[in-house]
Curated annotation (Swiss-Prot):
Protein name: Histidinol dehydrogenase
Gene field: hisD
UniProt keyword list: Amino-acid biosynthesis, Histidine biosynthesis, Metal-binding, NAD, Oxidoreductase, Zinc
Biochemical pathway: Amino-acid biosynthesis; L-histidine biosynthesis; L-histidine from 5-phospho-alpha-D-ribose 1-diphosphate: step 9/9
SUPFAM superfamilies listed in its UniProt record: ALDH-like (SSF53720)
Catalytic reaction equation(s): L-histidinol + 2 NAD(+) + H2O = L-histidine + 2 NADH + 3 H(+)
MF (Gene Ontology): histidinol dehydrogenase activity; NAD binding; zinc ion binding
Length: 429
């Protein structure tokens, strides 16, 4: 892992280059995704079967997971896993319940009523990755906010594999309250949820993380359905001063690096000695890490330690990066919170490591990446509702303001708009 001594602008340029390298998308991948989406839209289940055999090596007769298979799954999971899942569910619910909002009813003045109605989405599709790891935690993080919002039907898709779906995923889905589960993955699953097929119902919104093909497919179908966000590779920035613990920092950087070779792990510190210790500690921990090959590639390609003169400059640099995860291993981290403008999720102090947020604390782990924390937010209850405004005016209330409306409409050249107001107050013949 490279230790970099640069001024602010050079450091920022280097970080941007790291991110750009992590987000390079080959044109052939985009073309492949577009073709998959088009074929699923046109051929439905036939295309799903073809791509499932091609990419997953599995021939599936029935895409939907039976209730019997869901029930059997509990026989193959450990009690300790169930206890952990239930604790996570409790915390996720208690946190997200506080995000719920009420409809608004405003009697602005005599004869005027206006407001906003908040209603849940009717159908939501949740993508749960398979790939190199299984993510029961993603089931809870994506499904529970939707349930709290009041979504009527939640459909889950997850890639098939020999021997069936991981029972831990099925148990998590049952605990969270998923209504239907289908064994499809990749871009073809996203297309199926967006357009519907003979077997897969069309949904109103698709949420959940996935690989590059999934992310590009979500971008492709956005507008046909809504999506949560287009997630890039995982990323973490750790800001540390001389009080930082090198073992903790190295472990936290590797916790993101093990996700994906394209993940980004960056440490920004004011202390050169700590930087050297973190570098050595990363090498030491990599030796025993089960997913060391992935993590090492990520660290070598997209990892770095930056030396800066002050924590203020470290925070400025982090704000320019707008990372998915930001850890503050500094004195009085709570005091620095006010200066963090852009980050998906912020972890304060040495005993609030990123995996705490990933699994158990309650805040959502579906977070904006690739600098989009400047304008996107973590997944929340708000993502599963829609809002409609309403208004009511009496004849007298409209009469009082008619001249303003006519003036504005005529100024914009929309004379039928003006006429729609004027006609209500003309003398009837």
């Amino acid at each position: 892992m490279e230790i970099v001594f640069e001024d602010f602008q050079k450091a920022l340029s280097k970080i941007k280059l790291l991110r750009e390298n992590a987000n390079i998308i080959e044109e052939t991948v985009q073309r492949n995704v577009s073709e998959i989406v088009r074929n699923v839209r046109e051929s439905g289940d036939e295309a799903l079967s073809f791509y499932t055999k091609k990419f997953d090596g599995v021939k599936i007769k029935e895409f939907r997971v039976s209730e019997e298979e869901e029930k059997r799954a509990s026989m193959f999971v450990e009690n300790s896993f169930l206890e952990a899942l239930q604790e996570a569910k409790k915390n996720i619910i208690s946190y997200h319940e506080k995000q719920k909002r009420q409809s608004m009813f405003d009697c602005a003045s005599e004869g005027i009523i206006r407001g906003q109605i908040i209603r849940p989405l009717e159908n939501v599709g949740v993508y749960v990755p398979g790939g190199t790891a299984s993510y029961p935690s993603s089931v809870l993080m994506n499904v529970l906010p939707a349930k709290l919002a009041g979504v009527k039907k939640i459909v889950m898709v997850t890639p098939p594999r020999e021997g069936g779906i991981d029972p831990h995923i099925l148990v998590a889905a049952s605990l969270a309250g998923v209504d239907e589960i289908y064994t499809i993955g990749g871009a073809q699953a996203i297309a199926a949820l967006a357009y519907g097929t003979e077997s897969i119902p069309k949904v109103d919104k698709i949420v959940g993380p996935g690989n590059l093909y999934v992310a590009l497919a979500k971008r492709e179908v956005y507008g046909i359905v809504n999506i949560d966000m287009i997630a890039g590779p995982s990323e973490i920035v750790v800001i540390a001063d001389e009080t930082g613990n090198a073992k903790y920092i190295a472990a936290d950087l590797l916790s993101q690096a093990e996700h994906d070779e394209r993940a980004t792990a960056i440490c920004i510190t004011t202390n050169i000695e700590l930087a050297k210790k973190v570098e050595k500690e990363i090498e030491r921990q990599l030796e025993t890490l089960p997913r060391s090959e992935i993590a090492r590639e990520s660290i070598n390609r997209n990892g770095a330690i930056f030396i800066v003169p002050s924590i203020d400059e470290a925070l400025q640099l982090s704000n320019e990066i707008a990372p998915e995860h930001l850890e503050l291993h500094i004195k009085e981290p709570m005091n620095a919170l006010a200066y963090v403008k852009h980050a998906g999720s912020i972890f304060l102090g040495p005993y609030a490591p990123e995996p705490l947020g990933d699994y158990l604390a309650g805040p959502n782990h579906v977070l904006p990446t690739s600098g989009t924390a400047r304008f996107f937010s973590p997944l929340s209850v708000d993502d599963f509702v829609k809002k409609s405004s309403f208004l009511s005016y009496t004849e007298e209330a409209l009469r009082d303001v008619q001249h303003h409306i006519v003036e504005l409409a005529n100024k914009e050249g929309l004379h039928a708009h003006a006429r729609a107001i004027q006609i209500r107050f003309e003398e009837e013949e």
